Amino acid sequence: MAIFPRLENYSEVAIDTETTGLDWFRNDKPFGVAIALPNGYSEYYDIRKDLAAYQWLRDSVHKIRRAVNHNMKFDIHMLRKIDVHVNTRTAECTQIRAALINEHLMSYSLDSLAKKYLKAEKVDDIYEELAKLFGGPATRKAQAPNFHRAPESMMRRYAKVDAELALQLWQWQEEEIARQDLHEVWRLEMRLQPHVIESERVGIRVDEELAHKRIGDLTKIVDQTRKEINRLAGFEVNPNPSGSIKRLFEPYKEGDQWYAKDGTPIGTTDAGQPSLGADALKAIKHPAAGLILKCRKMIKTRDTFISGHVLGNIVDGYVHPNINQTKGETGGDDSGTEGTGTGRLSYTRPALQQIPSRDKEVAALVRPIFLPDEGQQWTYGDLDQHEFRIFAHYANPKSLIDAYTENPDLDMHQIVADMTGMPRSAPASGGANAKQINLAMVFNMGGGELASQMSLPYTWETATFKGESEARRFKKAGEEALAVMEKYYRAIPGVREVARQASSLAKSRGYVKTMYGRKIRFPGGMFTYKASGLVYQGTAADFNKRNICEIAEYIESECPHYRFLLNIHDEYSMSMVDEGDITVRHLKEMKRLVENKGLRVPIRIDFGGLAPNWWEATKMDAVTK
């Protein structure tokens, strides 16, 4: 006879679902639940057959003090479908914790982590057993849809071990988080988790009719662009990587360097052949090069994003993006990872961050597809030069800090332009400019790449770098670019020192830390020259997460009929009711919460007026000045 423990009596409980598939937002649902307790007890319950077990779970799970599992949000979504509710504010995910402990793993599956840290394994022979029963390859991907058809005894053996390993992994992680002093960043991820889960659950409304129309619009653009490419070439060109592109640009070699026929230096593949990838096409002056890039972009937007990611995932007028807080396993499969190592949120299904905010042509086609909740309006705010302001905080040059103190709304590129005498943005003919060198400093661009992007002289060199067995080619800045960089360092003291200090720390101890204590590691001492830039980016990502929490918690408390929608790059979007001055007052309070960071330089954001869709919201004038 089944035992039903009092789950609220335990400090933590591992709870794992067995489901008919992975699409909780469609028709898949749980058919079995396994638990594991700190006292060593574990059990599996087939809730299709055992009504008492289901009723016990429905009445008990919400009382669990701390529910733990691997990819916990998946189980939370699945259990909610059968009216079993997990407390999302206390639930803990071993997958998120694993990425805080080490962001460089090749796999974040439970099996992989159990082998690495616990010297234990899941029950893998279930795939062979299922293949014998139902046919098909003996892989997780092929056999997962057959789990609900498997004998209960087989599922019990498999599911209990999963719950037991998740609990053991959580217990090991408790000590490791303390050892690495990761408590602050883990608290941030815990605070964020309920908002991620709620955003996924409700989803984002989509204009399906407009999405289909956009496919037709993009097809016309692609066809027109291809015709123009073919006219310029004098023959038919396949815009995808192909021999016809090589024929069009006729690369030739002088010494060790490849050039396009217009004289543009281009890279070399590992096989020693000319590289005509995106970087080369951006540099080549022939008008067909830019059109090929445009054609590829439009094909990707049409086929991959709108047809695949959006229309392929609509359920009842909504898409339910998978939001990655950290790195994790890909789509519930064990075959790879997704997410970022710096902590920045990423979205899949659809990959919303792939809609380029600065590419107005694509944004104008795609963003109108996304709508606020029925009867509401979309509002949008974008942090002003967020990473550059964090960069200024760390570098702490007096001249820059004083300029921001005098006018918090200053444009950093213009500040640097005034200090160095450079133009703010790149002249049409190329050359040194403040915006490009700021980008280089924040993102640790090499001097040669900076020279290339500013159309200043550089050379190709070959060297073998630490930790690498084979030599590789790199761009080396010429004297003119080096002089520009030196001028920048003199005008803004502290920048070079912070970069050197971060690189030194990365080399000596193997990691650097963000303001929230997130560790960014450098295995084998590789790429330590990127350390300072990764600190800026990681700190910006942590602040973005804090901002989501501040906004979402304010909405829950003060205006629960509004809803936080998404965070892409440094943007925040909400679905709101137009209540005139009341809405503006709420937006001003959200602005205050976001800007209150206590840095040496002010953080700035303004929210715009309400609009019928995402794209129109980005064009609205600010109402929170």
Swiss-Prot record:
What is an annotated GO biological process for this record, any one? Answer: viral DNA genome replication
What are the annotated disulfide bridges?
none
Q: Where is this region: Disordered?
A: 324-345
Record flagged with keyword Protein biosynthesis: no
Annotated Gene Ontology MF terms?
A: 3'-5' exonuclease activity; DNA binding; DNA-directed DNA polymerase activity
> What InterPro entries does the entry give?
3'-5'_exonuclease_dom, DNA-dir_DNA_pol_A_palm_dom, DNA/RNA_pol_sf, DNA_polymerase_A, RNaseH-like_sf, RNaseH_sf
Q: Which UniProt keywords apply?
A: DNA replication, Viral DNA replication
The family line of this record is: Belongs to the DNA polymerase type-A family. DpoZ subfamily.
Q: What is this protein called?
A: DNA polymerase DpoZ
Q: Which organism is it from?
A: Salmonella phage PMBT28
- Lineage, opening ranks: Viruses, Duplodnaviria, Heunggongvirae, Uroviricota, Caudoviricetes
Which gene carries the instructions for this protein?
dpoZ
